[in-house]
Amino acid sequence: MILGIKSLRYIVVVATIAFGFTGLAQDKTVNDGVFTEALVSAGQVVYDAQCKTCHNMRFYRDTLRSWNNQPLLYLWESIMGTMPADNPGSLMFEEYTDVIAYILSENGFPTGEAELDPDNGMDSIAIVAP
């Protein structure tokens, strides 16, 4: 059976709509409650001990703006690879994740039931400017 041009166009349009909406449904942003209050509490402890000396929340507001529409995982990797400045990568993976949750919370993003995990889904969470 050979498909006509109209049939082929119809299939392409239907497939584009179906797959397009499926893709949109899977995308999350930091506005979607992608971290818990427990992560925020743990992150504040790490932030106060490791970050506060050099970085205030104004710094992070500007940082989040510069990462707008980028995956949250990229910011996590950047912070892990460069901080603390005197010993980059020296914190535990969970501590970097906790700090990210604290930074997001302090910039007005909502908590939720989801646990942030750099190995599971953080690459599909988009940063949006506060």
Which residues make up each language-model segment?
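Flexible coil segments in periplasmic/lumen-exposed cytochrome c-class electron-transfer proteins
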Residues: 91-130
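The canonical Cys-X-X-Cys-His
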Residues: 43, 47-57, 99, 103
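Short microdomains enriched in Cys/His and/or Lys/Arg
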Residues: 72-82
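Bacterial N-terminal signal peptides that target proteins for export
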Residues: 2-12
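Alpha-helix C-capping/helix-to-loop hinge sites
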Residues: 61, 82-86, 106
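Electrostatic cytochrome c docking/interface patches
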Residues: 24-46, 87
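Bacterial N-terminal signal peptides
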Residues: 10-20
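Sequence context surrounding c-type heme c attachment/ligation sites in exported
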Residues: 41-49, 61-73, 92-93
